[in-house]
Design a protein with these regions (language model features):
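Terminal, low-structured helical/coil segments at or just beyond the last alpha-helical repeat
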Residues: 31-36, 199, 203-205, 212-268
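Canonical tetratricopeptide repeat
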Residues: 72, 106, 139-140, 174, ...
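Helix-start (N-cap) detector for alpha-helical repeat units in TPR-like alpha-solenoids
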Residues: 67-68, 101-102, 134-136, 151, ...
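Structural marker of alpha-solenoid helical repeat scaffolds
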Residues: 62, 96-97, 127-131, 164-165, ...
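N-terminal leader/linker segments that initiate helical-solenoid repeat arrays
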Residues: 2, 6-10, 16, 20-72, ...
Length: 268
């Protein structure tokens, strides 16, 4: 299957369009840019994902009170973009197992997928405890706070996560995108370069850095960054598309044109 987090999706995203059109306005949300928390539905999930949903669904229907079965089914539904159903399954599971932190964490993510950010934050708070924090949940809480426009508070959560896993590129990537949302592109680039320099940095980190570099008008450099994950021709085409959108922002008389609606996605 083609990698879902391709830079083509990133550079053609509604998020980038909104950033360019609104100057990173307050209505923009981190879920539109990063897949660390919420991923948009894939219109054509591959056969492996569909099979996983079928298998998990059969197990769940055979024993809907089983926490592990509900968790697996909810995660499979999320992976194929079936957000509302995932939230419904996980909600029932958390009612049956109110103290199950894995279920609470998954339900919190599913709530965020559906745009219920405050409820997601409340649920995620119950998914771990101050004396035993989970850095992954801290990072997700940060992205939810960014969705709510509470960027300073979000960064405190990222800092707490980084205290547990110093230099973790996925957390640094979320932190960098938080700075994108507050219009501080140089700081965003600084943080994303920290993530980029990690031996554990994945394609999402490189694509996010390429986006931020491109948003600052350094297109050749952006192309060299994203080329690591794409054929040269595709990388060039995507950076050219970003350049076109930037030109469109600077010349509004050119009209908005037609922009494909897609976004970066990744593990939740």
């Amino acid at each position: 299957m083609r990698q879902q987090s391709s830079v083509a999706r990133l550079l053609a995203s509604a998020a980038v369009t909104a950033i360019l059109a609104a100057g990173l306005g307050g209505c923009q949300t981190v879920s539109d840019i990063t897949g660390s928390l919420t991923s948009k539905p894939d219109t054509s999930p591959d056969a492996g994902l569909r099979h996983s949903v079928e298998v998990a669904g059969e197990s769940y229907r055979a024993n809907p009170k089983d926490a592990d079965a509900a968790l697996a089914y909810g995660q499979a539904l999320r992976a194929t973009g079936q957000r509302a159903q995932a939230a419904a399954v996980l909600e029932q599971a958390t009612i049956a197992h109110p103290g199950n932190k894995d279920l609470l964490a998954a339900y919190g993510r599913a709530l965020a997928d559906n745009g219920n950010f405050q409820q997601a934050l409340d649920t995620l708070t119950r998914a771990h405890s101050p004396d035993n924090p989970d850095w992954r949940i801290l990072s997700v809480q940060g992205t939810v706070l960014d969705q709510l426009g509470r960027h300073d508070e979000a960064r405190r959560y990222y800092a707490s996560a980084l205290n547990i896993v110093p230099g973790e590129p996925s957390v640094l990537s979320n932190l960098g995108l938080s700075y994108v949302l507050s219009r501080d592109l140089p700081k965003a680039e600084e943080v994303l370069r920290q993530a980029y320099s990690s031996g554990k940095a994945d394609a999402r980190v490189r694509q996010n850095l390429g986006l931020v570099v491109g948003l600052q008008g350094r297109f050749a450099e952006a192309e060299s960054i994203v080329r690591a994950d794409l054929p040269a021709a595709e990388a060039a085409a995507n950076v050219a598309y970003l350049k076109q959108m930037l030109s469109r922002k600077d010349n509004p008389r050119g009209g908005p044109g037609t922009v494909p609606m897609a976004s970066l996605s990744g593990p939740g």
